């Protein structure tokens, strides 16, 4: 609804990890806010608690984004909407059109009121592991990006409030990320579609 991601709260955070749609060449990230108080605090926290040299008013750390990474992101950002976002949406549309009528394969439909960045293109199927192996054998790399829920991690496992996450667990065992990036071609996506269709044609039960 024409409101940018990251602007729904007091602060928004973005990862610029190299594998992201808008990625630097090393670890990087950013925070946005229109609150001057929070902005100043973030500036201090990222620089050992100081904005002006030797004026340390709180405990902070070195979280400054170096100039090289900033320059890389600045160049990439200029082409992000025109090149990256547009290309990923075009390729995602091929998936959505070509895979929509396959029995046993479920797609996450895009919403009319939102623009999707398609950092990942995720499908859902009971035959997730078999499909992944089939595509791997065809030299098509797929990913299970998040094989564990947060509640399964040791740090959270014994905390209260997440004993019966049956829907999340069920979904987590069915989802698979298909290849998608601005560097993929239409021909490559159609090849992936062809192999997915082949898999389901011989694995109907």
Give short role names for the model-derived ranges.
Residues 6-7, 24, 31, 170:
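Solvent-exposed polar/charged
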Residues 21-22, 30, 65:
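A residue-level structural signature of the nucleotidyltransferase/glycosyltransferase Rossmann-like core
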Residues 1-23, 52-57:
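Conserved active-site segment immediately N-terminal to the catalytic lysine
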Residues 34-205:
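PLP-dependent aminotransferase class I/II
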Residues 12, 24-28, 71-73:
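Adenylate-forming
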Residues 14-15, 29-34:
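Short beta-strand-to-turn element immediately C-terminal to the catalytic PLP-Schiff-base lysine
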């Amino acid at each position: 609804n024409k409101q940018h991601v990251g602007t729904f709260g007091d602060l928004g955070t973005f990862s610029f990890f190299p594998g992201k749609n808008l990625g630097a060449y090393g670890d990087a990230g950013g925070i946005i806010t229109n609150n001057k108080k929070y902005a100043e605090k973030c500036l201090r926290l990222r620089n050992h608690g100081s904005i002006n040299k030797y004026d340390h008013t709180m405990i902070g750390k070195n979280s400054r984004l170096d100039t090289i990474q900033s320059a890389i992101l600045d160049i990439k950002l200029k082409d992000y909407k025109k090149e990256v976002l547009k290309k990923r949406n075009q390729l995602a549309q091929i998936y959505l059109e070509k895979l929509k009528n396959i029995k046993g394969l479920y797609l996450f439909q895009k919403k009319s009121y939102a623009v999707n960045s398609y950092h990942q293109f995720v499908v859902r199927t009971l035959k997730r592991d078999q499909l992944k192996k089939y595509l791997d054998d065809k030299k098509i790399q797929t990913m299970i990006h998040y094989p564990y829920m947060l509640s399964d991690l040791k740090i959270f496992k014994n905390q209260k409030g997440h004993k019966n996450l049956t829907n999340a667990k069920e979904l987590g065992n069915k989802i698979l990320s298909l290849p998608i990036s601005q560097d993929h071609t239409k021909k490559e996506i159609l090849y992936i579609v062809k192999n997915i269709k082949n898999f389901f044609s011989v694995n109907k039960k």
